[in-house]
Amino acid sequence: RAGGKWGEYPAVYPHPIDQNILPHIDSFLETGYTKEEMKMVNETHKIFADDSIGVSPTTVRVPVQGGHSESINLEFEKEFTLEDVREMMKNTPGVTLQDDPANCVYPMPLYAWGKNDVFVGRFRKDPSVKSGLNFWCVADNLRKGAATNAVQIAEKLIEKGFLPKE
C-alpha cells in the first residue's frame, strides 16, 4: 500500500518508505552512484559549461509531500566571510535567507512547498578545505527548476567575485 507499514513493501520502493529514508534514487550503476546522482553531476557540468567542476552527490528519498533539499559544499577561489555570504543571499532575488540555527530557524521542505523562492541557511565554514562553505537549501521543485536556481546562484557568485567570469 502507498506509504507502506513495517513489513509491507510497496512495489515502487525496495523497502518501506513510511518512517524511513532510502539512500538512493533510481538504479545503481557500476560506479556505485545512481542514475539520479550522475544526472546531478552532468546537469551541473552542462549548466556551468565546465566539466572540471567537482560534484559528488548522494541522493536520498525522504517521505515528504514535496520539494528538494540539498546539503551543499562549495570551495571558492578566494577567502570569504559568512556575513558576506549571508548578505549576498539576503539580497538575491528568488532566495530567502533562513539562517538562525540557535533559534531553530533554517530551511525545511514543509515550509517551502508551494512557494517560488529557494530557501537557504545553516551557513558555516568547511574546515576540510581552505575556502569552503557548507549550507542547506530547500525548494519546491515544481516551482523552482534546478537549472534556474543554479544559474541565479552562479550569477551572484560571479558578480561578487567568488567564481571566475570565464
Question: Where in this protein do the model-derived segments appear?
Answer:
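Active-site-lining helix/loop region of Rossmann-like oxidoreductase modules
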Residues: 1-88
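C-terminal active-site/capping subdomain that shapes the small-molecule cofactor and substrate pocket
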Residues: 53-166
